[in-house]
Amino acid sequence: MNGTSCVICDAGRFQAGGADMIFNFDNMEEKMIPEFKGGSGCFRPRMFSDEHMKIMRARLEPGASIGFHTHDTNSEIIFMLRGRGVVLYDDGAEELVAGQCHYCPKGHSHSLRNESAETIEFYAVVPEQ
């Protein structure tokens, strides 16, 4: 590698060393956030965040949603790991299934709903810009 020290995050604690920045979401506390961004049900993220970035693995139970919101100072990338959800964005809507990625650019709005009978799980990355 290039000899610079990177960071490893395990359960939210940092250690210098290693070649990559690694997040072990299984060791992070799962939060339960009701009606996130005005949505319904419970948003359940395991999350790393600092002043530059939020990186999370999250779940939405059947019938739960993340409310419609605008990304004024950042963008968001959602990669669906399991299940199928519905993404509402600006003035459209599309199904998002496991293996697909949704990108909401800075200045745009979106929401994610779980209209299925199973829990959905996804990664989300929100870089500040």
Regions picked out by a protein language model, each given a short descriptive name:
Residues 57, 77, 92-94:
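Short, surface-exposed secondary-structure edge patches
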Residues 106-129:
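Ligand-binding loop in jelly-roll beta-barrel domains
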Residues 91-106:
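Short acidic-glycine-tyrosine-enriched beta hairpin
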Residues 84-86, 93, 109, 119:
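Structural motif
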Residues 51-52, 73, 92, 117-118:
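Short strand-connecting beta-turns/loops that link adjacent beta-strands
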Residues 59-61, 72-86:
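Short, conserved beta-strand element in jelly-roll/cupin
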Residues 1-54, 67:
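A short, N-terminal "cap"/entry segment at the start of jelly-roll beta-barrel domains
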Residues 65-67, 86, 102, 106-112:
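Histidine-centered metal-chelating micro-motifs
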